[in-house]
């Protein structure tokens, strides 16, 4: 044994990152969607706004917007694999929009170290006056905040319930819990 590492574990492959990555498809529970929309309404008059949902998935947020009185023509939603009639197929990160006055409300795909969520935020910042994201608590760190468009500032940060998400392939809830916050940026 050398350096506290046995012979069998010295191979490069044994230290490889074995975390699986995929399409980051974790969908938001409808009760959590309602909490997010209510929180957004405390800071933003959504009654006449155009809403951008760039990670539409199963349409949980789209359904929430409709429940909260937002007319369907004012909702724009994308996903690479849409599972709702009002969610258009498309990669938001490759999308160019005409308006700069959207309100973005979403549960973005996080990615490793929030890499995808940061990309979603920075792309949305080109088109939105407000960005409202359901994200891991790590977004409270300066290292995350400093990687976001500096023209935006945090106006609200709310702790969310422990079990915010479900996956379409799992019939039982996941045992590991992700601590999340709902942040509103302007």
Task: Please identify what each model-predicted range represents.
Residues 1-186:
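Class I S-adenosyl-L-methionine-dependent methyltransferase catalytic core
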């Amino acid at each position: 044994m050398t350096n506290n590492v046995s012979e069998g574990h010295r191979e490069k492959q044994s230290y490889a990152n074995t975390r699986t990555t995929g399409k980051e498809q974790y969908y938001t529970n409808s009760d959590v969607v309602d909490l997010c929309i209510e929180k957004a309404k405390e800071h933003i008059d959504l009654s006449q706004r155009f809403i951008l949902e760039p990670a539409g998935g199963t349409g949980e947020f789209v359904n929430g917007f409709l429940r909260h009185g937002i007319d369907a023509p004012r909702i724009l939603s994308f996903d690479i694999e849409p599972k709702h009639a009002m969610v258009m197929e498309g990669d938001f990160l490759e999308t160019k929009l005409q308006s700069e006055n959207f309100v973005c409300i979403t549960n973005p795909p996080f990615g490793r170290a929030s890499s995808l969520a940061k990309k979603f935020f920075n792309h949305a910042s080109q088109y939105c006056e407000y960005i409202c994201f359901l994200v891991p608590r790590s977004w409270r760190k300066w290292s995350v905040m400093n990687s976001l468009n500096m023209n935006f500032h945090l106006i609200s940060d709310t702790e969310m319930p422990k079990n915010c998400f479900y996956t379409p392939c799992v019939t039982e809830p996941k045992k590991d819990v992700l601590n999340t916050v709902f942040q509103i940026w302007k």
